[in-house]
Amino acid sequence: MGPCAAPPAFAQGKAADPRKPDPKAAQAPAPVRPSAVDKINDWGVYAAGAGKAKACYVLAEPKERAPKTLKRDPGYVFITQRPGEGVRNEVSVVMGFDVKPDSTPKAEIGAASFPMIAKGGNLWLKNPAQETDFVNALRKSPRLIVKADSLRGNTTTDTYALAGVGAALDRATKECQ
C-alpha cells in the first residue's frame, strides 16, 4: 500500500459492508503498457515498467503461414528480458490457435531443431537452458520455422524472417540496462 492510500476499513477496526464499495480502499495500479522503442526490419523493440520491474522484448509476426487456408489469430515470436528477475532471452511463441496437447511442436533455425512445449496457444522452449543457443542461432540464420499441430489435427508452419533480429536484441538489451 502506498503512503497516500487510506488503510482498508477492516484495518481501522471497522467492519466493511461487503455490499458497498469502500471509496478509501486502495485500487490496484493500472497495468503498465509497453512502449515501442524501435523497429528494425520486421522486429519491433518494446519496453514496459521501470527499475527492477522493467521488461524489454523483441517481437515479430510470421512472414508466411501454412496452410494458407486455415483461419487463425495472428502469431508472434517474443524474446524477453527482465533483468530485475535475472531473465535474459526468454523465448515464447503465440501460435494464434490452441495447440494439440501432448503434441511435439518445434522451432527450426538452420540445421538446429529446438523442441517446444505448449500451453493453449503458446509455446516455450522445452529446455530453457537452450535459450542462449536459440538466440545465437537466430542471429546467424535467415529464418525461423515454427511447426505445431492444432487441436483439429492440422500441422501448421509459421516462418519468420530474421533480418535485423540481432540489432533488435542488442537494442532491447541496451534499453533494459
Task: Write out the residue ranges for each language-model feature.
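Sec-dependent N-terminal signal peptides
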Residues: 1-12
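A generic "folded-domain core" signal
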Residues: 10-177
